[in-house]
Amino acid sequence: MAGPTYDESAIIDVRALTKSYGQVRAVAGVDLRIGRGEVFAMLGPNGAGKTSTVEILEGYRQRDGGEVRVLGLDPAKQGRLLKQQIGIVLQSTGVDQYLSVAETIVMYSGYYPHPRPVDEVIELVGLAHKRNSRVVKLSGGQ
């Protein structure tokens, strides 16, 4: 029997995603498709399953049911490969706020076997003009 087909133009393709913690259903049948270049926000009250959903997409948490593809990969089965292609930045982190943008990228590049050049990453995220700025001086969105 053939498995489900996926929209290959989608960066994220989620079908019938479920996740429970004991008797509590945190994620109940989420369907989601995000295409290249789309901007997406997930909003909801505490306990709505936002963090669980994102952690499943990142490959840091196992789903109970449903199908997930991120960049064409199943995070549950190909998490290591996926993590080499994505980056997650939380608005508040434990990073030293007095490091510069460039110093911070150098520090995190050590987690990757084949990191991109620092200046390339800074350019990709639109922070070339903030290269030497201290992280503490950046806005939350930067």
Which positions does each model-derived feature cover?
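N-terminal acidic, proline/glycine-rich, low-complexity intrinsically disordered segments
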Residues: M1-P4
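ABC transporter nucleotide-binding domains
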Residues: Y6-Q142
